[in-house]
Structure formats: structure tokens, C-alpha cells
Amino acid sequence: MTIEELEKVPFHFVAHMSMEDMHTTTYESDDGRFGFCDHVPFKNGEPHGRTFRHYRIGLKVYKSKAKFIEALKDV
């Protein structure tokens, strides 16, 4: 699969978890094959630090976009 093909896959909101030190929002493709989570660190009630994203194919989680893109070639 290519990035262009992935961009055509519809995603929907699944969950949002708000903790004192981190907010996490999770999205999943309509067919359940792909997902991603956006993580926002918080400190004293305000966003603090760098936001990051984890990617998922099936049950395998990728912490870098480069590794995720490499794994897409096998899908």
C-alpha cells in the first residue's frame, strides 16, 4: 500500500483519554486495519512539550512514521 492509497482510507474517532500529564486521542480506519493515536503532554493544565503520534497496522504499533511507511509496503 502507498501513502496515496492510505490517504483515501476513511478514519473515525474512537476514544479520547484525558489524564493530568497526557491527553490521547485515538482514531481507527472503518475496516479496523489501521489506526493512530495523537498524544499531547500536559503540565499544569496546559499543553507542554512536543505532540507525538503512534501508528498501528493490525495489532502492531509503530512509533515512527518512517517505520510505519516501510511496513505499509507489505500490506
Placement of each model-derived feature along the sequence:
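Amphipathic alpha-helical segments
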Residues: 1-12
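Acidic, low-complexity, intrinsically disordered interaction modules
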Residues: 12-66
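A short, charged, amphipathic alpha-helix used as a generic interaction element across diverse proteins
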Residues: 64-75
